[in-house]
């Protein structure tokens, strides 16, 4: 009997570095065009979003720099790990995000990749502005103080 594809067993790959290096101004969920071996690798959790970003080319939005590892059982018909992948958006969303992405200092960054309830791969894109060094330090201080408070609350 085959195992059902529930929410619990589907991997969620998050770009934790993006939360540290960027202020997220807006979020958008979009689909991604993948090959079969890429989907299998994603289900195994073999993905790196460290160097990934979104790029607007003409009327399309592309995910560039995402590294989906080759699927070992796909031998001859395997995919190229770092190829650009087309993101699937509605035309209104695409135009709105493309116009905002062309503003100075804004970048499209993939925040996470996951499978929805229907088993389709989705990308959560963020419209982000880079943090300055003092902003990063402030974020680290807040996280440290929150951790200390949580630790103290657990002791009581």
Where are these regions (language model features)?
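Basic Arg/Gly/Lys-rich low-complexity intrinsically disordered segments
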Residues: 1-16, 135, 142
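Switch/connector loops and helix/strand junctions flanking conserved nucleotide-binding motifs
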Residues: 71-73, 122, 133-135
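Flexible glycine-rich active-site/ligand-binding loops centered on an Asp-His dyad
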Residues: 130, 136-153
């Amino acid at each position: 009997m085959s195992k059902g594809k529930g929410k619990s067993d589907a991997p969620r790959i998050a770009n934790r570095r993006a939360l540290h290096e960027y202020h997220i101004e807006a979020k958008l969920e979009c689909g991604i065009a993948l090959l079969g071996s890429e989907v299998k690798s994603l289900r195994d959790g073999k993905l790196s979003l460290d160097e990934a970003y979104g790029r607007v080319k003409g009327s399309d939005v592309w995910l560039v720099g995402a590294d989906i590892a080759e699927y070992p059982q796909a031998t001859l018909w395997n995919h190229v790990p770092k190829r650009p992948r087309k993101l699937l958006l509605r035309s209104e969303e695409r135009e709105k995000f493309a116009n905002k992405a062309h503003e100075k200092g804004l970048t499209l960054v993939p925040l996470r990749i996951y499978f929805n309830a229907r088993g389709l791969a989705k990308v959560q894109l963020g419209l982000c502005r880079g943090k300055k060094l003092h902003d990063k330090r402030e974020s680290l201080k807040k996280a440290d103080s929150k951790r200390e408070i949580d630790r103290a609350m657990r002791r009581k």
